[in-house]
């Protein structure tokens, strides 16, 4: 169990209430557990929150009564259902009287759940979709959130340095991934922030490859994409290393990706257009003839979820979104040659009004391992 230590949790609900004026709703029902955690501090697996100008209610079932008493911000009244079947059954007992416009997160609710919720609440409650409202609040991180992400990245960095100090050639991708994840836990992480990727040679040309029971061979590039989780917050980083001597083609491709990554990092600052930052890296890679081999976006936000707003990608419109102070984002260009190798270099950054704060400490010059 994790005890919430954020001093800003109560203020988050206040900010959410201010945001309710946009969609013109009286209250919001928060059901996604990551959003519930952000607003209340609760880390269990069954809970919801009802928030309005004069309402702060948290609902869970018997299994989490003691946990919620420790974790949930004291500004919330805590309620318990008699069963764990549907916490929404308790809502009629806590909603204010009269006609109500109730916001709900349609991006985290199935059609079946929506139908059941409407049946529970009846005609006096009008359900209004407000998907993404809490996620928008979560985007810009406060100081405590940033330090948790920084702590997660420091653990991840130390674990990778320990892995690279030992032998890799002859060991399997899966064996190395398990060692990396075990080491992060020993160093204080609650676990990996996502399933680690260790992919050698042609397998590295799959951007989201899964580690195999296949030994790494001399002469291969090895893509390592990993992260740690600390108090719910994620880190994310990628390094590509050389297992012994590699070909000139692979080395040149690595230097290309590195130059694109460095240029994109230099472009990160508050007010910068998210589409344009992606274009900085993409143009460098395309000019070298590898545009078709860089198919994913340049980066994404990181926080309680491993993928959050903002998105830095060619798939968004130019001018649609700008970086903000205290966005936490990845910069991760890559080149993937099917049947040959893959290369990705990724840092985790905090956006400032000037140059970004780079949370990743591992050097990016090509490293040769044994």
Language-model features: locations:
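Active-site neighborhoods and metal-handling regions in enzymes and metal-associated proteins
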Residues: 1-370
